[in-house]
């Protein structure tokens, strides 16, 4: 659990997301409240529930990115789902309880990785012994083993091919599900049973693999680390992490709104909302790893609400999403900042990609302004897809260079207004063309 202050959280989010200060402040406070709750006594801690958030704003303005970056900062189990992927209980499809099951699986992976890091030193020593055994043989004298150990640590044996026996983690039936009783087995989905999990339980299989010494280390360290981990402890920690600090991001919540004058198929969407109610309010969900209480999981719902309005959500669901945050549409100036100020700016990405072909790319201020202007213009005249438009525009600008870069090794390319005009000019002048190409 992160102990960052709200100001530090917002500052961290500013590195990747431009603007949207209201949304950043709301999620920063929600995350800090997690830490505050942990400082309380046991009697009061269970009474403090998270204040769930509803983000309202057009596509491509940073709703999903804010939540994703927040989860990384919090070092918390996180899952992003689309509300439209789920169906009402009783219908064919995934029910909303699958969200929590997937969150538990994500937590298992996260906790296992963290625990592997803790035992990495021991696992490294054990892996080294296994490599020496493969090189020198099981019955080798200590003197011989020491000689191999010195060569191994000096990197002299990195290209030597050895044969190793490692745990077989493959799961050929992993995605194979068969119908079962409603409610599923061990908390699978409704009426679904995962054959892969059943056979995985039998486990213990090993496979022989031929690898170079250098390539074998990562595999062996992972194998040895897993031997040092206690599966029961991993599961227990994962369930606790989900219950106490899990974050669920539900996108496209506006797509399951039934408009007030709707009839027929639209009305069935309310079923998904009704199923979400107990999940967000607090219920116990059965999973294959054990029961999970959802009382203290933070839910962040988001939607563009172009057609439906937040008031079209079920009143009970509105009440369970008490914090409303409006995200504004992005402007040309925002696009300039996105291309220059963020740590993961597209300009830096393209410069680095071209550098692998020994082509030096430099963006001028005028070039960046031209890219931002075109993106804003097309958003206005065609369809506003926010910052995602920048991907389309830059990909189009670099289309020719990306193709010819291997033949231009050693060249220097300046992306200025002329370069942008040369690669995009015709398209931007023709609305019909930009409608289909950009």
From Swiss-Prot:
ATP binds at residues 18, 60-65, 251, 316, 388. Keywords: ATP-binding, Chaperone, Cytoplasm, Nucleotide-binding, Stress response. One of its GO terms (biological process) is proteolysis involved in protein catabolic process. InterPro entries: AAA+_ATPase (IPR003593), ATP-dep_Clp_protease_ClpX (IPR050052), ATPase_AAA_core (IPR003959), Clp_ATPase_C (IPR019489), HslU (IPR004491), P-loop_NTPase (IPR027417). Pfam families: AAA, AAA_2. Its main location: cytoplasm. Transmembrane segments: none annotated. GO terms for cellular component: HslUV protease complex. One of its GO terms (molecular function) is ATP binding. It comes from the Bacteria. It is found in: Cytoplasm. Gene3D superfamilies: 1.10.8.60, DNA helicase RuvA subunit, C-terminal domain, P-loop containing nucleotide triphosphate hydrolases. A double ring-shaped homohexamer of HslV is capped on each side by a ring-shaped HslU homohexamer. The assembly of the HslU/HslV complex is dependent on binding of ATP. PANTHER family: ATP-DEPENDENT CLP PROTEASE ATP-BINDING SUBUNIT CLPX-LIKE, MITOCHONDRIAL-RELATED, ATP-DEPENDENT PROTEASE ATPASE SUBUNIT HSLU. Belongs to the ClpX chaperone family. HslU subfamily. NCBIfam families: hslU, PRK05201.1. ATPase subunit of a proteasome-like degradation complex; this subunit has chaperone activity. The binding of ATP and its subsequent hydrolysis by HslU are essential for unfolding of protein substrates subsequently hydrolyzed by HslV. HslU recognizes the N-terminal part of its protein substrates and unfolds these before they are guided to HslV for hydrolysis. This is ATP-dependent protease ATPase subunit HslU.
